[in-house]
Amino acid sequence: MQKAVVLDEQAIRRALTRIAHEIIERNKGIDDCVLIGIKTRGIYLAKRLAERIEQIEGKAVPVGELDITLYRDDLTVKTIDHEPLVKGTDVPFDVTNKKVILVDDVLFTGRTVRAAMDAVMDLGRPAQIQLAVLVDRGHRELPIRADFVGKNIPTSSSELIVVELTEVDQLDQVSIHEK
């Protein structure tokens, strides 16, 4: 059951614009920066960030797509023959010596980010890995912190954060739901 909308379309747009500026400022430009979105919604957020960065800097930043299914320690979705459902990684550039900015919709326990870092390290040796998330809801199980956060939304363990994006859900909003 939905309790409250915490970010609407305009608030999401503002948060992503701010994150884009923070990425540029922290990295003193975008040279050697690449964005890698974590499937599924992180990919669309990474593409939106890339558009904003290009508008601000006048240069394109490469964007990749990361499927972390095989790196997770809590596989849940399996195919009929009990194998993990893999959607595919598409990182069409070398990450070696790059500043990799992982992009995801929600930071919760940190397990997704840990799996994403493992997947990135299998692609090469980045100079640095940074993390950008639309929502940080707390409840970390691993010592992981986002470098760029759209909004901190403290939640209870009985609540869910639901991120809906136009590309997947036909609307942009973040809401809190009761489990």
Curated annotation (Swiss-Prot):
Against Pfam families, the record matches this protein to:
Pribosyltran (PF00156)
Its protein name is Bifunctional protein PyrR
Query: What does the record give as the reaction this protein catalyses?
Result: UMP + diphosphate = 5-phospho-alpha-D-ribose 1-diphosphate + uracil
- Read off the NCBIfam families from this record: PRK05205.1-1 (NF003545), PRK05205.1-3 (NF003547), PRK05205.1-4 (NF003548), PRK05205.1-5 (NF003549)
Give an example GO biological process: DNA-templated transcription termination
Q: Motif PRPP-binding: where?
A: 100-112
Keywords recorded for this protein, A-Z: Glycosyltransferase, RNA-binding, Transcription, Transcription regulation, Transcription termination, Transferase
Q: What does this protein do?
A: Regulates transcriptional attenuation of the pyrimidine nucleotide (pyr) operon by binding in a uridine-dependent manner to specific sites on pyr mRNA. This disrupts an antiterminator hairpin in the RNA and favors formation of a downstream transcription terminator, leading to a reduced expression of downstream genes. Also displays a weak uracil phosphoribosyltransferase activity which is not physiologically significant.
Check the record and name the SUPFAM superfamilies matching this protein. PRTase-like (SSF53271)
Q: Which GO terms describe its molecular function?
A: RNA binding; uracil phosphoribosyltransferase activity
Q: How does it assemble?
A: Homodimer and homohexamer; in equilibrium.
Taxonomic path = Bacteria, Bacillati, Bacillota, Bacilli, Bacillales
Q: Origin, by domain of life?
A: Bacteria
Q: Which family does it belong to?
A: Belongs to the purine/pyrimidine phosphoribosyltransferase family. PyrR subfamily.
The EC number on file is 2.4.2.9
Q: Which InterPro entries match?
A: PRibTrfase_dom, PRTase-like, PyrR, PyrR_bifunctional
Origin species, per record, is Geobacillus sp. (strain WCH70)
